[in-house]
C-alpha cells in the first residue's frame, strides 16, 4: 500500500511482506501460522511509535461496522478473495495485496500500478479507511498516513482488525480438501456431548461441500441436513448407523421416477465420499427439482422451508407411483387376476413386492459428473421382479407406449396410465373436469363401463383421470357404484394420490392390507407425523378431533401485544366506516329476549341486531349512541351457551379434563418467547373460539329445540342466509396437540418472516431476528395427546440446524449438522473404513457448512445461532 506519511516505526514483523508469508509456510502448520499472524499483527498495530500518533478524524465517517458484517461472506470464502474492480472489469492479476474498505466491506487491490483501493477512495471520498487483510495495517487516504492504536485513540481500528481475524479464511492456510475458519483456532471450543473420545484425538473433516449454482445456498443447506439424517441413510446405504431402527424397506432407484432417482443417486455418492473430492455440484438433482418447480430459478433468493416442503411432497408422490407400478408388475409376474378384490391375493402380492429389488443399470455411480440429460435419454426401462421360483423380466418400451392407444395417458418418466391392459383397452381418457362432474352423462358412462368390466382396482396418476373398478357382480355392487359416482369420493381419491395417502374406505379394501401398503412409503414413514386439532364445545361439551398429516411443525415466535391489536382493530373499523365498497348483506339472527324468563318465542329487533355474524356493519346511529350490537350479541351468545350446556359422560369428562385442564385454560400466552419450549407452549395453548371465530357444532344441532326452534337455545333460523341445518355456531375451546404416529425425524420451522400491519392498513414484511434458545435434547411428552403420554417416551435429539442471516430481501443460508464424516488421524489408516465401508467415525461431531466451505464446529457455537429450522431425530 503506498504511503506518503508514516507515523510509526517500520515494523520488523516478517508477516508485513506477503512473500515472507509464502516462504514461511513450509516451517509452520496452518494453525500456528494463523495464530502467529494474529498475535504479531495486532502487536505491531499497537507498537509504541517513535513520534506521538495523531487521532484520525475520518474514522467516524470512514468506518461502518454494520456494513462490514453484511459482507463477511467474502472473507469466509477463499474463492471470493478478489479485487472488486478487477472482477468487474475481468482483469486477471496475481500476487497482489488485498485491502478491506472499512466503509462498504469490499476488497480492493493496492500493490500495483492501478491501485484500485485509491481509485475507490477518489470515487467515494467517505471510503477513505482501508485495512490490509494479511498484515492488518490500517491506512487513511484522506490523511495519507497509517493509523495506529495508541493511548485509547483510534480504537475502532482494533474492532475492524478483530473482525477480519474472526472471519478470514485464507487460501494460504487451509488444509487440503478441508476448509477451516480461523475463528476455530482462536477460541477453545467446548466439546459436544455427542462427540465421544479423548481430547488428544485429531480429526480431519471429509464431508464434501456443495457448489453454489447461483444463489442456491437455500438448496445446499437443506441437502446437507438431509444427508446427515441417519434414518434416511439407513434406508439407502447398505450399512446402518442405527441398528435399533426399524427399516420399512430399502429405498432404491427406479426408472419410473426421475426426481427420486436423482435424489437417491446424490445421497449414495455423498455417503461414499472419503475426502478426495472436497466440493460436489448437485446439478442433476437441482435440475430435476427445478423442472418440476420452475419458480426456483438460479440467481434468485428462495425460502429453504418452502423448498423442503415441496421436495418432500414430490418424493412421496413419486415413491407412491413407483410402489403402484412395482406392485402391478409383481401381480402380473404371479399371474394374478387383474381384479385385485381378493384381500389374500393382494396381501400376497404386497409381501412379494417387498422382495423385489428394482435397479437402474443406466445410472452412473459418479453423480457429480453426470449431466442433466442422462436420465432422459433412455430408450427403454427394465424392471426385474424376483418372486419365489419365478423370474420374469418385464420390459416396457417408451416407443411402444407411444404407439399404443392414443387415448391412454402418456408419461415421460413416471407410471403407465393404466396398470392393466384390460382397463386400458376399455377406458377412454376424459379430462378431470368432466370426470368429476356427477351430472355429466359422459362421466357416468365411463364409471359404468369400468364397473361392469372385470378390470383393475387401481389408482391412476394424479395428473390423469381416476379409475376404480370392482370385480363383484352387478347386483351386489350397486351400492358401491353410487359411492364411485359420488363427486366427494372422486375428489377425495385425487387428493389421496396427491398427498400419498391411502384410505380403506376409499379403496374398499381390507384396512390391514391398506395399512401394510401405506407403511411401505419410506420417505413418508420417516418425515410424516400427525397433528390433531381438538375442539370442545362450551354448550354440549362435545369433543371433536380433526387429525391432519404434517411433515414439519411451523410455530410462530412473534405474538403482538393486546394493546397493538386493539389499535389495529380501531383503524380497521375506521377505514371500513368510510369505505366506498358496498356493504355486506346483513344476517337476521334470532335470539332470546334477555329480560324475559318465559319460554315464549323470541322477537327479532332488526334495528339493533341487524349485524353480520361474519363481520358485517351495523347502522351508524347504533354505533354513535350505544355499544356495538355485535359486542352485545357475542356476550348474549356466550350466556346462551352456558345456559344450554348439558350433561357429559365420565369418559368424555376425563378426556376434556386432561386436554383442557384448569391450568391450561388459565395460563396466559407468552408474548415474548425466549426458548423453543415457550414457542411450543404457545402453539399448544388453549384458544377460545368466539365472536367471528365461533365453532360450528354439529352435536348441538342434533339436540332438541336448536335450529329454528322458538324455544330457548335457538341460535339461527332456517331462513337465514348463513344458517346450516347440520351445525350451530357455538363458543368453544380449541387446542393443537401432536398425535400418534410421531415421525422418526421431527422438523420444527420457526416463523421468522411475518407481515406487520401498520396503523394505515399496509402490510410491511419483516424478519424477526430474536434469539430463540434450543437444546440438544427435546422432550415432546407435554405436547402430545394425553392417551399417549404414559405409553412411551417422546425424546428427540438435535442433528441439524438451518440458519438464515441477513434481511428479508437479501441473506444467506448456512447449516450446522451432526456428521460422521470425519477421519481419526490418531488411529491407524486401516481402521478408517473398518467401521463401515463408508469413510467416517462411529461418533458424530458438529460441522459448519456454507456452500463449499466445511469446517468443524461445536455445540457451544451451534447453541448461539439464530435458528430458522431445527431437525430432531427420535432416540
UniProtKB/Swiss-Prot annotation:
Transmembrane segments: none annotated. The keyword Zinc applies. It is an enzyme of class 3 (hydrolase). The lineage of its organism: Eukaryota, Fungi, Dikarya, Ascomycota, Taphrinomycotina. Residues 208-875 form the USP domain. Residues 396-486, 575-628 are annotated as: Disordered. This is Probable ubiquitin carboxyl-terminal hydrolase 7. The modification Phosphoserine is found at residues 333, 337, 486, 493, 645. The gene is ubp7. A zinc finger (UBP-type) spans 54-167.
Amino acid at each position: 500500500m503506498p504511503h506518503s506519511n508514516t507515523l510509526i516505526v517500520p515494523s520488523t514483523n516478517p508477516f508485513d511482506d506477503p512473500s515472507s508469508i509464502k516462504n514461511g509456510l513450509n516451517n509452520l502448520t496452518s494453525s500456528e501460522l494463523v495464530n502467529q499472524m494474529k498475535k504479531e499483527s495486532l502487536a505491531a498495530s499497537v507498537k509504541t511509535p517513535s513520534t506521538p500518533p495523531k487521532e484520525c478524524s475520518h474514522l467516524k465517517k470512514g468506518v461502518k461496522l454494520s456494513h462490514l458484517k453484511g459482507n463477511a461472506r467474502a472473507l469466509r470464502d477463499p474463492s471470493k478473495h478478489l479485487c472488486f474492480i478487477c472482477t468487474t472489469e475481468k482483469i486477471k492479476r496475481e500476487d497482489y495485496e488485498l485491502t478491506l474498505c472499512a466503509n462498504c466491506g469490499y476488497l480492493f487491490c493496492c500493490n500495483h500500478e492501478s491501485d484500485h483501493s485509491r481509485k475507490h477512495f477518489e470515487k467515494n471520498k467517505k471510503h477513505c479507511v482501508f485495512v490490509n487483510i494479511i498484515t492488518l495495517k490500517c491506512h487513511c487516504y484522506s490523511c495519507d498516513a497509517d493509523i495506529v492504536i495508541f493511548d485509547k485513540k483510534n480504537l475502532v481500528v482494533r474492532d475492524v482488525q478483530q473482525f477480519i481475524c474472526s472471519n478470514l479464511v485464507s487460501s494460504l492456510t487451509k488444509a487440503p480438501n478441508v476448509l477451516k475458519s480461523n475463528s476455530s483456532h482462536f477460541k477453545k471450543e467446548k466439546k459436544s456431548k455427542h462427540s465421544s473420545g479423548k481430547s488428544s484425538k485429531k480429526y480431519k473433516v471429509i464431508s464434501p461441500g456443495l457448489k453454489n449454482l447461483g444463489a442456491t445456498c437455500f438448496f445446499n443447506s437443506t441437502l446437507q441436513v438431509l444427508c446427515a439424517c441417519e434414518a434416511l441413510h439407513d434406508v439407502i446405504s447398505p450399512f446402518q448407523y442405527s441398528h435399533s431402527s426399524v427399516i420399512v424397506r430399502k429405498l432404491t432407484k427406479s426408472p419410473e421416477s426421475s426426481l427420486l432417482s436423482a435424489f437417491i443417486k446424490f445421497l449414495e455418492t455423498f455417503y461414499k465420499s472419503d475426502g478426495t473430492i472436497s466440493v460436489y455440484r448437485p446439478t442433476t438433482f437441482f435440475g430435476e427439482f427445478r423442472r418440476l418447480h420452475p419458480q426456483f430459478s438460479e440467481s434468485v433468493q428462495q425460502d429453504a422451508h418452502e423448498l423442503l416442503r415441496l421436495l418432500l411432497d414430490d418424493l412421496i408422490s413419486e415413491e407412491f407411483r413407483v410402489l403402484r407400478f412395482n406392485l402391478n408388475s409383481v401381480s402380473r409376474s404371479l399371474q394374478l387376476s387383474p381384479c385385485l378384490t381378493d384381500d389374500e391375493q393382494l396381501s400376497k402380492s404386497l409381501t412379494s413386492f417387498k422382495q423385489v429389488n428394482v435397479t437402474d443399470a443406466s445410472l452412473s455411480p459418479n453423480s457429480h459428473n453426470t449431466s442433466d440429460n442422462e436420465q432422459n435419454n433412455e430408450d427403454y426401462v427394465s424392471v426385474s421382479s424376483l418372486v419365489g421360483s419365478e423370474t420374469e423380466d418385464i420390459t416396457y418400451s417408451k416407443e411402444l407406449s407411444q404407439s399404443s392407444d392414443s387415448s391412454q395417458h402418456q408419461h415421460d418418466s413416471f407410471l403407465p396410465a393404466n396398470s392393466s391392459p384390460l382397463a386400458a383397452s376399455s377406458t377412454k381418457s376424459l379430462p378431470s373436469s368432466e370426470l368429476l362432474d356427477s351430472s355429466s352423462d359422459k362421466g357416468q358412462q365411463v364409471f359404468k363401463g369400468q364397473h361392469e368390466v372385470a378390470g383393475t382396482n387401481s389408482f391412476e396418476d394424479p395428473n390423469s383421470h381416476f379409475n376404480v373398478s370392482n370385480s363383484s357382480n352387478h347386483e351386489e355392487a350397486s351400492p358401491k357404484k353410487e359411492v364411485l359416482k359420488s363427486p366427494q369420493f372422486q375428489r377425495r381419491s385425487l387428493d389421496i394420490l396427491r398427498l400419498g395417502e391411502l384410505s380403506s374406505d376409499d379403496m374398499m379394501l381390507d384396512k390391514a392390507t391398506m395399512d401394510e401398503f401405506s407403511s411401505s412409503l419410506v420417505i413418508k414413514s420417516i418425515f410424516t407425523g400427525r397433528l390433531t386439532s381438538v375442539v370442545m364445545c362450551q354448550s354440549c361439551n362435545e369433543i371433536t378431533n380433526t387429525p391432519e398429516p404434517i411433515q414439519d411443525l411451523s410455530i410462530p415466535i412473534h405474538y403482538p401485544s393486546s394493546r397493538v391489536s386493539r389499535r389495529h382493530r380501531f383503524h380497521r373499523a375506521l377505514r371500513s366506516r368510510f369505505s366506498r365498497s358496498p356493504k355486506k348483506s346483513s344476517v337476521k339472527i334470532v335470539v332470546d329476549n334477555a329480560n324475559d324468563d318465559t319460554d315464549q318465542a323470541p322477537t327479532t329487533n332488526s334495528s339493533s341486531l341487524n349485524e353480520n355474524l361474519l363481520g358485517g356493519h351495523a347502522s351508524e346511529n347504533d354505533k354513535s349512541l350505544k355499544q356495538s350490537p355485535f359486542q352485545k350479541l357475542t356476550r348474549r351468545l356466550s350466556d346462551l351457551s352456558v345456559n344450554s350446556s348439558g350433561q357429559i359422560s365420565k369418559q368424555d369428562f376425563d378426556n376434556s379434563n386432561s386436554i383442557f385442564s384448569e391450568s391450561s385454560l388459565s395460563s396466559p400466552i407468552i408474548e415474548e418467547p425466549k426458548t423453543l419450549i415457550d414457542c411450543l407452549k404457545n402453539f399448544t395453548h388453549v384458544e377460545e373460539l368466539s365472536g367471528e371465530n365461533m365453532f360450528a357444532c354439529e352435536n348441538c344441532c342434533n339436540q332438541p329445540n336448536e335450529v329454528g326452534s322458538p324455544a330457548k337455545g335457538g341460535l339461527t333460523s332456517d331462513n337465514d342466509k348463513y344458517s346450516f341445518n347440520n351445525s350451530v355456531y357455538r363458543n368453544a375451546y380449541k387446542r393443537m396437540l401432536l398425535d400418534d404416529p410421531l415421525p422418526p425425524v421431527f422438523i420444527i420451522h420457526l416463523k421468522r418472516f411475518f407481515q406487520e400491519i401498520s396503523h394505515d392498513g399496509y402490510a410491511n414484511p419483516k424478519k424477526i431476528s430474536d434469539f430463540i434458545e434450543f437444546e440438544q435434547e427435546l422432550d415432546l411428552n407435554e405436547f402430545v395427546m394425553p392417551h399417549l403420554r404414559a405409553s412411551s417416551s417422546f425424546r428427540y435429539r438435535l442433528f441439524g440446524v438451518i440458519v438464515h442471516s441477513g434481511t428479508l430481501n437479501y441473506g444467506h443460508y448456512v447449516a450446522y449438522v451432526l456428521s460422521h464424516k470425519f477421519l481419526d488421524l490418531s488411529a491407524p489408516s486401516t481402521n478408517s473404513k473398518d467401521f463401515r465401508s463408508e469413510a467416517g467415525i462411529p461418533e458424530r461431531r458438529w460441522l459448519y457448512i456454507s456452500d463449499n466451505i466445511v469446517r468443524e464446529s461445536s455445540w457451544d457455537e451451534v447453541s448461539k445461532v439464530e435458528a430458522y429450522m431445527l431437525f430432531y431425530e427420535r432416540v
